[in-house]
Amino acid sequence: MIALIQRVKRADVRVGDRTTGEIGAGLLALVCAERGDNEAAADKLLAKLLGYRVFSDAAGKMNLPVSNIDGAGGAGGLLLVSQFTLAADTNSGLRPSFTPAAPPDEGARLFDYFVAAARERHPVVETGEFGADMQVSLVNDGPVTFWLQVRP
């Protein structure tokens, strides 16, 4: 599974004229299931995402996870947005191949599992809508962006 995470001041996702999720300071994670991924891969990616230290401590070093963005136990928001294009094969030609991405039904199942697991482990979780045409807005803080990928 893949997550492209961005440290944000704020972020939101809309489907048409409806806001499906929005957060203040925290992480926006674009999430993609690849062929062969399973719940174990989702759990491993979620643990990495929740523990990844990308927020600054009092000394200005990236040393704090999203569960403690202020150094005093305050949790930041987590906005999870499905994005199958992260699995694109861009090695040949001028058109990406999405063969490496999980099929839509499996991708939806794993994304739903990932969201449910995140909600069990983190207090502020918002989402986009799987398979929808979404508009994502964010104010990137830094900018700080990381590619996280785990294999089953």
Swiss-Prot record:
Keyword Transcription belongs to the record: no
Record organism: Burkholderia ambifaria (strain ATCC BAA-244 / DSM 16087 / CCUG 44356 / LMG 19182 / AMMD)
PANTHER family assigned: D-AMINOACYL-TRNA DEACYLASE 1, D-TYROSYL-TRNA TYR DEACYLASE
Source organism phylogeny: Bacteria, Pseudomonadati, Pseudomonadota, Betaproteobacteria, Burkholderiales
Enzyme Commission (EC) number: 3.1.1.96
Subcellular location, record wording: Cytoplasm
Function recorded in the entry: An aminoacyl-tRNA editing enzyme that deacylates mischarged D-aminoacyl-tRNAs. Also deacylates mischarged glycyl-tRNA(Ala), protecting cells against glycine mischarging by AlaRS. Acts via tRNA-based rather than protein-based catalysis; rejects L-amino acids rather than detecting D-amino acids in the active site. By recycling D-aminoacyl-tRNA to D-amino acids and free tRNA molecules, this enzyme counteracts the toxicity associated with the formation of D-aminoacyl-tRNA entities in vivo and helps enforce protein L-homochirality.
One Gene Ontology biological process: D-amino acid catabolic process
Protein name from the UniProt record: D-aminoacyl-tRNA deacylase
Entry superkingdom: Bacteria
